Each structure stands twice: as structure tokens, then as C-alpha cells.
């Protein structure tokens, strides 16, 4: 019976040793997984830092060169200089006659400039407002400002000749 108890104790001790070895192997695998996770996290953080630096450089570049790039892009797309600046956000207005000109493509601008339709409309509106210059007297000239004092002028040394008629 003691032989059987000794064998059972040996098997129990071997089972305990196997459990301990298994636990050590598991802990080593867990440590390896944590190490791999830390390496991945470090790589990810380095990439995030590089992306943030790149984003800051891009934001800085766009804040400095962005408006010029937008204007150049609009010019390359065929807009005239004023329309390109307006597309880029300049806020300037272009008034022809009594009309506020919208943003137009350069081809549209050329056709308007060649036909002079906008100029003729502006002149006709001015005619309705001011009338025609035909048959009207010239408007009086008005001079504004401080009056200039003049001094008397004496003609010295000029003796007109005499005539006998």
C-alpha cells in the first residue's frame, strides 16, 4: 500500500511540477505578447507624432501660401485676375456702371468686353438719369476753395506812343 501511496504522491508532485512549468510558459507568452503590444504602441505613437508634425506643417503652409495657391488655381482654370482674387476670398467688388459684376470666367469676360453690351447699357442708364447733352447749356463751373487776393498792378515803364488821326 505504501508503494501505491508513494506512486500517487509522485504523480501528484509531477502534476504540480507540470502545472508550474505550464504557468511559467503561459507567463512568458503573456510577457512576449505585452512586449509586442508595447512595440506596436510605440510604432503607432511615432507614426501619430509624424502625422501631427506633417499636419502642422501643412496647416502652416496653407495659412501662408493658401490664398496665393487658390488664386493661381483659379487663374489656371481660366478666370481673370479680379475674379480669381474674389474666388480666393478677397471680398472686393467690381462695379461696371450701376451693376455689380458677378464672378465670371475669362471667356465670358472677353465676350462682354468685345461686344461692349455692358458699356452700352451703362450709358443708356446714365442718359435716363442725366439726360442728353444736346441743346443743353454747359453746366456752370464752380470753383471751391479760399479766394485768392490780388494786388493792384501798376504798369511802369511802358509809354504808349502817340498817334495823330
Swiss-Prot record:
Pfam family, any one: Calici_MSP
Principal localisation: virion
Lyase found in the keyword field: no
Key words, A-Z: Capsid decoration protein, Capsid protein, Host cytoplasm, Virion
One cellular-component annotation, GO: host cell cytoplasm
Subcellular location: Virion; Host cytoplasm
Origin: domain of life: Viruses
Cited function: Minor structural protein that forms a portal-like structure at a unique three-fold axis of symmetry, following binding to the host receptor. The channel formed by VP2 may allow the delivery of the viral genome through the host endosomal membrane.
Record text on subunit structure and interactions: Homooligomer. The portal-like structure consists in 12 copies of VP2. Interacts with capsid protein VP1.
Extra information: Translated by a ribosomal termination-reinitiation process from the bicistronic mRNA coding for VP1 and VP2.
Family: Belongs to the sapovirus VP2 family.
Written domain comment of the UniProt record: The N-terminus domain points away from the virion surface.
Protein name: Minor capsid protein VP2
Species of the source: Sapporo virus (strain Human/United Kingdom/Manchester/1993)
Taxonomic classification: Viruses, Riboviria, Orthornavirae, Pisuviricota, Pisoniviricetes
